[in-house]
């Protein structure tokens, strides 16, 4: 399974590594779970609609979401 970060999501990931290690741990748990079961599991996965149809989101915390798309053998974040 290959993770592909868009520029903005990679910048966010690097930001959280500097600011909040607990949040990075949660993001890593979500990514690991997504690679096993992309459409169910932790973080309350839900499909997005309209402009983001085909994408899914999972809760990092009450305010932040991890948005991703599963295509072929890639997880686009």
Question: Where do the protein language model's features map onto the residues?
Answer:
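Short, surface-exposed charged micro-motifs
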Residues: 67
């Amino acid at each position: 399974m290959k993770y592909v970060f868009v520029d903005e999501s990679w910048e966010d990931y690097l930001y959280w590594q500097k600011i909040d290690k607990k949040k990075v741990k949660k993001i890593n748990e979500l990514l690991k779970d997504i690679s096993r079961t992309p459409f169910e599991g932790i973080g309350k996965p839900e499909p997005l609609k309209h402009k983001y149809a085909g994408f899914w989101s999972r809760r990092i915390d009450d305010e932040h979401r991890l948005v991703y798309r599963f295509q072929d053998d890639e997880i686009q974040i």
